[in-house]
Amino acid sequence: MADPDVLTEVPAALKRLAKYVIRGFYGIEHALALDILIRNSCVKEEDMLELLKFDRKQLRSVLNNLKGDKFIKCRMRVETAADGKTTRHNYYFINYRTLVNVVKYKLDHMRRRIETDERDSTNRASFKCPVCSSTFTDLEANQLFDPMTGTFRCTFCHTEVEEDESAMPKKDARTLLARFNEQIEPIYALLRETEDVNLAYEILEPEPTEIPALKQSKDHAATTAGAASLAGGHHREAWATKGPSYEDLYTQNVVINMDDQEDLHRASLEGKSAKERPIWLRESTVQGAYGSEDMKEGGIDMDAFQEREEGHAGPDDNEEVMRALLIHEKKTSSAMAGSVGAAAPVTAANGSDSESETSESDDDSPPRPAAVAVHKREEDEEEDDEFEEVADDPIVMVAGRPFSYSEVSQRPELVAQMTPEEKEAYIAMGQRMFEDLFE
């Protein structure tokens, strides 16, 4: 059977006491937070955030301040959501028994502090010497008193001392204590009224409660969301397939059909026009190399050469080098013949040499298209012969006399003896040799 003296509801006096204290000694944020806890016995932190519209950091600072002063208590509970996730929530409530004790303690501490200040700042006489500025208390009055003159004199300079007005208290401590008692009287009255109140355990340690205002707003929001979902159901169905799908994330379907590749390639080639031959196949990109005119002068058929190039899309590298060397040799021989014709006739020995070179050049003329497929060994031998021929030192005419090019290069006085035509031929030959060297 329950004790008739135990109260199952919080008395109005305790609620007024909490409101008076929180509004008298704390800020407006603390008062708002405590008002919610007065109206609702145990409130979750998230619900307080929803009601007060505070920032979470600001609300926690306010609650931690009240909790540090023992006005409120905190209880942590672990809750399991519908999806199985566990979350921790803080619930705050007021323990009114602790609240009353804390208020009594703080008021008593304030009263003792005021009484201490009153006792320390009692109107005690203090003396100061106007000459040496020495100060004396009322306990030193027997040393300052001069019985001959009946005055208080300084013990150092024997000058009559004066009462120190700066040491007088600014306010009367007894007046301050009376004002404190007058202002705190309503709180004292509430404390006397709640002196013998005995609260039940479920009031001192309440269970979490649902706030009606928040419950109504949540129900209204749920109803609105349900109506919106019913109204836009077909829209969600249309977007149902737009969500992320991870079933076929690592599935790749590759189909390889080798039969149709040749037909597709042939059809693509038929649809495209024939590409124009690049300039590096039609003409030489090296300055001084053979061109169409040189090829005609050298007895090379341009059409036959192009047919051979088209017939062999990928000629051998050795064959290309050989043809280039043959044509360069042809040009060198023609230049040498021109220089000899411009100067005096050469000796019979030199003539025999030029004839042998001409015959060798004729023997080494570019092969006909029918002779392209000769044996690899024969091509290597011909290439070696060509390199040996190119390595021969050309002949330069100096005042009608033949000299080797290397000899003229080492003897500058021979260049001074040349005629203008011989000097021009000498310079042209040097340029061709330089171009042949870097090709």
Curated annotation (Swiss-Prot):
Species of the source: Homo sapiens (Human)
Family: Belongs to the TFIIE alpha subunit family.
Biological role stated in the UniProt entry: Recruits TFIIH to the initiation complex and stimulates the RNA polymerase II C-terminal domain kinase and DNA-dependent ATPase activities of TFIIH. Both TFIIH and TFIIE are required for promoter clearance by RNA polymerase.
UniProt main location, coarse: nucleus
GO molecular function: RNA polymerase II general transcription initiation factor activity; zinc ion binding
UniProt-annotated location(s): Nucleus
Pfam families listed in its UniProt record: TFIIE-A_C (PF11521), TFIIE_alpha (PF02002), Zn_Ribbon_TF (PF08271)
InterPro entries in alphabetical order: TFE (IPR039997), TFIIE/TFIIEa_HTH (IPR017919), TFIIE_asu (IPR002853), TFIIE_asu_C (IPR021600), TFIIEa/SarR/Rpc3_HTH_dom (IPR024550), Znf_RING/FYVE/PHD (IPR013083), Znf_TFIIB (IPR013137)
Positions carrying N-acetylalanine: A2
Binding site for Zn(2+): C129, C132, C154, C157
Keyword Mitochondrion: no
Gene: GTF2E1
Name of the protein: General transcription factor IIE subunit 1
SMART domains given in the database record: TFIIE
Self-association state and partner proteins as the record states: Tetramer of two alpha and two beta chains. Interacts with TAF6/TAFII80. Interacts with ATF7IP. Interacts with SND1. Part of TBP-based Pol II pre-initiation complex (PIC), in which Pol II core assembles with general transcription factors and other specific initiation factors including GTF2E1, GTF2E2, GTF2F1, GTF2F2, TCEA1, ERCC2, ERCC3, GTF2H2, GTF2H3, GTF2H4, GTF2H5, GTF2A1, GTF2A2, GTF2B and TBP; this large multi-subunit PIC complex mediates DNA unwinding and targets Pol II core to the transcription start site where the first phosphodiester bond forms.
Residue ranges occupied by any HTH TFE/IIEalpha-type domain in the UniProt entry: 14-104
Compositionally biased spans, kind Acidic residues: 354-364, 379-392
